[in-house]
């Protein structure tokens, strides 16, 4: 199977800072004085992780909170760069990494559809042609013309996934943003992801819901303590993970 995601010996580090200022005025007027880089101190998000994902595969990243799953998705999506190693992808990548990502809080849901869909590679005419399908999928009703600053987290998830549902990516990347939606909408999203898979779209996503992983995924990548622990079939890795978490 031809790999369309190649994650090769990737390490991502972030510098650590500590607060040495005396109060909020220092933060506003003297930010350089208020924060000081802890020389030599870094946070290691992931370390020497390698994996590939083949064209048309559905793969889940699992692991404890803070293990490095979301960092890995961000690297594949291209929103962050590795400290070491290389990350390459082939084709159009559509990602939903955080609630409200790619949206402007002062714009309405409808206006944000134009904004987000454009960021995902659709032309304005294509957005217009798909607008009603996006709105119908979102189930937001009259709220579609309200500014999204009044939206709940569940409504933001609905809007974001509704746009994703109408793009035509080669690679679909989803962090665990679906967990905030209602059960019926979650089921609709899972079915949409399965439909993407049937059409040959490559899927990489993070989930703590092993039932969803089993429904969608061919393989699972288990990240533990910022390193790759296991890669294998969904059934085998999920069983190992459940045993480790027990």
From Swiss-Prot:
Give the UniProt keywords, A-Z.
ATP-binding, Cell inner membrane, Cell membrane, Membrane, Nucleotide-binding, Polysaccharide transport, Sugar transport, Transport
A single GO BP term for this record reads: polysaccharide transport
Q: Which organism is it from?
A: Klebsiella pneumoniae
Its taxonomic path starts at:
Bacteria, Pseudomonadati, Pseudomonadota, Gammaproteobacteria, Enterobacterales
> Per UniProt, what is the membrane topology?
Peripheral membrane protein
Q: What is this protein called?
A: O-antigen export system ATP-binding protein RfbB
| Annotated gene | rfbB
| The organism's place on the tree of life at top rank | Bacteria
| Entry function | May form an ATP-driven O-antigen export apparatus, in association with RfbA.
Q: Which Gene3D superfamilies match?
A: P-loop containing nucleotide triphosphate hydrolases
Coarse class of the protein's main subcellular location: membrane
């Amino acid at each position: 199977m031809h790999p369309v995601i190649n994650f090769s010996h990737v390490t991502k580090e972030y510098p650590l800072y500590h607060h040495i200022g005396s109060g909020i005025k220092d933060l506003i007027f003297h930010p350089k004085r208020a924060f000081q880089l802890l020389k030599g101190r870094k946070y290691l998000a992931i370390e020497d992780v390698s994996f590939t994902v083949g064209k048309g595969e559905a793969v889940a990243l699992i692991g404890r909170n803070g293990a490095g799953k979301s960092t890995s998705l961000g690297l594949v999506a291209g929103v962050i760069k590795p400290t070491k190693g290389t990350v390459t992808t082939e084709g159009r990548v559509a990602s939903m990494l955080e609630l409200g990502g790619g949206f402007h809080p002062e714009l309405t849901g409808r206006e944000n559809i134009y904004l987000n869909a454009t960021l995902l590679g659709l032309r304005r005419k294509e957005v217009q042609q798909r607008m009603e399908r996006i709105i119908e999928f979102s189930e937001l009703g009259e709220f579609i013309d309200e500014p999204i600053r009044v939206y709940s987290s569940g409504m933001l998830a609905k809007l974001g996934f509704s746009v994703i549902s109408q793009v035509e990516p080669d690679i679909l990347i989803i962090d665990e943003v679906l967990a905030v939606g209602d059960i019926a909408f979650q089921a609709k999203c899972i079915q949409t992801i399965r439909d993407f898979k049937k059409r040959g779209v490559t899927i990489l996503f993070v989930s703590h819901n092993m039932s969803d992983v089993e429904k969608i995924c061919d393989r699972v990548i288990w990240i533990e303590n910022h390193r790759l622990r296991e890669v294998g079939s969904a059934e085998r890795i999920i069983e190992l993970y459940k045993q480790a978490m027990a």
